[in-house]
C-alpha cells in the first residue's frame, strides 16, 4: 500500500536485502492479499513481531500494546484479524518476551534512575555503574539477547514482569482476537512465567495456541502446563541432512523421523509446528537449487503429523540466503507468470492433501 508509506520507505523490489531497508509492507497489504492466501488453502498466518519497535526486524519492542506505525494501527490489525476469521484463517503473533528494546519504558527508567528505579528487578543487571555503556554485554554488566546492548533481557521470574506480560497477552486477545502466540527464544523464558501465563490465557480463550521457539528437545516445556507445541527444527534438520547434505542413509532418516515423533506426547505431535525454512534460516530453494528435491521435501512436510507451515514465497520457490536475505520482498508483480502459477498450483495441491 504505497499511499501509506513514509519518506524512509524504499521502493518495493526483488532481489537480495539487508537489515537496513524498509520496503513498506504493512497490515493493510496483508488484508488485501487474504483472498490470495485463502485460494492457496492457507488456514493460518504466523506474523513476525508487529508491535512498536525501532528496528526493521521488530524484535526490540518499545511498546507491547501498540501496533508499529510502519505496519498500521491497532484498528487495522483488528480489521485484518476479523476478515481473516471470516475466511477461516487464524492469526498467530510473535511475542518477544525474552528481551525488549532500549526504548521500552521500564528500561529507560532503569537507565535514568539506576538501582532506585521501580523497575530495577525487571532486568538482570550486574553492574549499575556501567549500565549505560555502549557495546556488547560480554563484560556481564547486564544480561541481554545475543550480547547486544540494544536488547536487555527481561527477568521473567519477577512476579511484576509476569503480571505485566499476562496483561499484554490478555489485551492482544480481547482487543485483536488473536488465535495463537509464538514465543521468541522460547527456551530462555522462565517456566514459572509460562505456567502462569497459560493458566491466565486459557481462562480467557480456551483454544489459544501457544508455540515455543525451541531448536532442540523441548520435552520439559511440553508437559501440558506451558506450550502446546514447538517449532520442529529437529525434523527440519533431519530432512535437510537426508535430501540435501546426503549425510543420512534411508534407515537413518526413518530413525530420525521416528525419534522426532517419540520425543513428545501424541497431543503435542498432533499440533507440532513443522517447517522447512523460516525468517531465521536460509530459504528452502536456496538450499536445494533443484526443484525436484524442493518438492520432495515439501511432500514429506505435508505428509507428516502436525501443522505444516510454509514461509511466504515458498509457493513460488522464492530464493534467499541466511538472515536477513531470507526476508526478501514478495515479488507480487511476477506472481501471475506462467512459471509461478504452475508452482503455486503444485503447492496448492499439497495443501489440499490436508483438507
Mark where each language-model region is.
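Conserved, mostly hydrophobic/aromatic
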Residues: 37, 47, 64, 84, ...
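The substrate-binding groove and active-site-proximal loops of carbohydrate-active enzymes
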Residues: 12-28, 60-74, 147-162, 179-188, ...
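Active-site-proximal helices and loops of the catalytic beta/alpha 8
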Residues: 81-87, 99, 104-115, 170, ...
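Active-site clefts of carbohydrate-active enzymes
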Residues: 266-289, 325
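Active-site groove signature of glycoside hydrolases
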Residues: 97-99, 150, 163-191, 269, ...
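Aromatic- and acidic-residue-enriched segments that line the glycan-binding/catalytic groove
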Residues: 3-9, 56-68, 97-140, 199, ...
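N-terminal structural segment of carbohydrate-active enzymes
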Residues: 1-90, 105-109
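Hydrophobic faces of well-ordered beta-strands that scaffold small-molecule active sites
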Residues: 45-47, 91-93, 181, 210-212, ...
Amino acid at each position: 500500500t504505497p499511499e501509506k508509506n513514509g519518506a524512509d520507505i524504499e521502493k518495493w523490489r526483488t532481489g537480495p536485502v539487508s537489515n537496513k531497508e524498509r520496503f513498506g509492507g504493512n497490515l493493510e497489504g496483508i488484508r488485501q492479499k487474504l483472498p490470495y492466501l485463502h485460494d492457496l488453502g492457507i488456514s493460518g498466518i504466523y506474523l513476525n513481531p508487529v508491535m512498536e519497535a525501532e528496528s526493521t526486524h521488530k524484535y526490540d519492542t518499545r511498546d507491547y500494546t501498540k501496533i508499529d506505525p510502519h505496519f498500521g494501527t491497532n484498528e487495522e490489525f483488528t480489521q485484518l484479524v476479523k476478515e481473516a476469521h471470516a475466511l477461516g484463517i487464524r492469526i498467530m503473533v510473535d511475542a518477544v518476551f525474552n528481551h525488549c528494546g532500549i526504548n521500552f519504558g521500564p528500561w529507560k527508567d532503569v537507565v535514568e534512575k539506576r538501582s532506585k528505579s521501580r523497575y530495577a528487578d525487571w532486568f538482570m543487571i550486574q553492574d549499575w555503574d556501567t549500565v549505560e555503556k555502549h557495546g556488547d554485554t560480554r563484560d556481564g554488566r547486564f544480561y541481554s539477547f545475543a550480547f547486544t546492548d540494544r536488547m536487555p533481557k527481561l527477568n521473567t521470574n519477577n512476579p511484576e514482569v509476569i503480571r505485566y506480560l499476562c496483561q499484554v497477552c490478555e489485551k492482544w486477545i480481547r482487543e485483536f482476537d488473536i488465535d495463537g502466540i509464538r514465543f521468541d527464544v522460547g527456551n530462555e523464558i522462565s517456566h514459572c512465567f509460562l505456567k502462569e501465563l497459560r493458566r491466565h490465557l486459557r481462562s480467557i480463550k480456551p483454544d489459544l495456541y501457544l508455540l515455543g521457539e525451541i531448536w532442540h528437545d523441548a520435552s520439559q516445556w511440553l508437559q501440558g502446563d506451558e506450550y502446546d507445541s514447538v517449532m520442529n527444527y529437529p525434523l527440519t534438520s533431519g530432512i535437510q541432512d537426508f535430501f540435501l547434505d546426503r549425510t543420512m542413509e534411508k534407515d537413518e532418516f526413518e530413525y530420525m523421523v521416528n525419534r522426532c515423533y517419540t520425543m513428545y506426547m501424541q497431543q503435542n505431535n498432533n499440533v507440532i509446528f513443522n517447517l522447512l525454512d523460516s525468517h531465521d534460516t536460509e530459504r528452502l530453494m536456496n538450499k536445494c537449487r533443484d526443484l525436484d528435491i524442493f518438492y520432495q521435501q515439501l511432500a514429506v512436510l505435508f505428509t507428516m503429523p502436525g501443522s505444516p507451515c510454509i514461509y511466504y514465497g515458498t509457493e513460488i520457490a522464492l530464493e534467499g540466503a541466511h538472515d536477513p536475505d531470507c526476508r526478501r520482498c514478495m515479488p507480487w508483480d511476477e506472481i501471475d507468470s506462467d512459471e509461478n502459477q504452475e508452482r503455486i498450483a503444485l503447492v496448492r495441491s499439497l495443501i489440499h492433501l490436508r483438507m
